[in-house]
Every structure is written in C-alpha cells, then in structure tokens.
Regions:
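Conserved ABC transporter NBD signature motif
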Residues: 18-26, 33-34
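Catalytic Walker B motif of ABC-type/P-loop ATPase nucleotide-binding domains
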Residues: 111-114
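ABC ATPase "signature
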Residues: 170-171
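Conserved ABC ATPase "signature" region
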Residues: 58, 62, 67-82
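Conserved ABC ATPase signature
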Residues: 86-90
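Helix-to-loop junction immediately C-terminal to a conserved catalytic motif
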Residues: 10
C-alpha cells in the first residue's frame, strides 16, 4: 500500500481513481518538472555490481541542472571514505545511507523516503534522523513511509495511516493518539490499521 501510493504520486503507476497533484504539478503530464524538484529513495534499489559510490553519485548529479554537493552529503552521512568503493562492497547500512544521499543530490523541494532506516543500527538511525531534522528545519519537505513509530514521532509533522490501501487517519501524532483508546503511537497505529493482537514483524 505505502510504496504503491508513492509510485502513484510520482507518476510511476496510475491510480484506480482520483487526482494527484504535487507542487502544483500533474505527475503524469508534467513528470519532467517534477523530476527536477523531487528526490526519491525507494525501499529496494538495485545498481550495477561494479559501479563505485563516486560513479553513481556523479551519474545522478549529471541528471540535474543544479545538483547538491554530493561529497558534502556523503560526509554528513558518514560514508565519504567509501567514495572509491563499489556499491556492492558496502554494508546494508552504508548502502541505505547512500540511497538517501542519492535522493538528496537533486537538491529537491520534496524528498520521498521509503522505509529509509531499514537495515541501520540504532546509532546510525539516530544520526540519519538528526540530519533529516536539520534539512526539514531548512525548509525541505519530507514524504516518509515507515513502520517504525519512533521514527514517525521524531520526523513527521503530519501522518497518514493506511489500512488495506485506504487512508484511515490523517493528522498529527498527538491527534492519532487522542482519537484512539491508547497512549502510545505504536498502539494507536495498530488500532487504526486493525492489527491489534496480531504479530507484526515490523515492530
């Protein structure tokens, strides 16, 4: 559900019904303009085994008119020393941080992050949160999909909870808790999603 919504917003998939607008643009008729203004990090990204971090960043930067300073982004995300390394040689956490850097290279107005801290340890997750909070405070809009409620509480001003592909809640974290019979967002999420009492592998 979450990734499909993201793909519809970006014009990769057509929705069954309704209309979509991002930054005042239609993702199906104005994809080029949207491409220049957004950055995307999908949950699963695959690249050539032998391509290096530097080559991948250079290739990505070449697609945009005014790309961000990717060496600085790599430094901030703690992987600048991997510049000459093949992407296939990176650990899962390093690869995930690289994918976030690639999403930020367009110097976007909106960045889409799909399960951005999957595979990161606790320390690395918090470092990524800190950087994203700084970017958010500078005016970057972050569209985040996540199963980690601690991450949602730290990074999100507004949240949308999906149940079987349908939005069942939209509002702030405090509103979600207030409208549920629980005091924690994780419990409120399970209640809205109809997963109370079920085993959820993502928690």
């Amino acid at each position: 559900g979450k990734s499909s919504v993201l793909e519809c917003i970006l014009g990769i998939k057509k929705p069954d019904s309704g209309e979509i607008s991002i930054l005042g643009l239609n993702p199906f008729t104005q994809r080029k303009q949207i491409f220049e203004k957004t950055g995307v990090q999908f949950q699963e990204a695959h690249y050539q085994d032998k391509i290096t971090v530097e080559e991948l960043c250079e290739t990505t930067a070449s697609l945009y008119r005014n790309p961000a300073d990717y060496p600085e982004l790599l430094r901030r995300f703690g992987i600048k020393d991997k510049l000459k390394s093949a992407v296939s040689e990176l650990s899962g956490g390093q690869r995930q941080r690289l994918f976030i850097v690639l999403a930020l290279i367009p110097d976007p107005e909106v960045v889409f992050l799909d399960e951005l801290t999957t595979g990161l340890d606790v320390k690395a997750r918090r470092e990524v949160w800190k950087i994203l909070e700084e970017l958010k405070n500078k005016g970057l809009t972050i569209f985040l999909t996540s199963h980690f409620m601690d991450e949602v509480e730290v990074l999100c001003d507004q949240i949308c909870i999906l149940k079987k592909g349908k939005a069942v809640f939209y509002g702030t974290v405090s509103e979600a808790i207030r409208q549920s019979p629980y005091e924690k967002l994780e419990d409120a999420y399970l209640w809205f999603a109809g997963e109370e009492g079920e085993t959820n592998e993502d928690f």
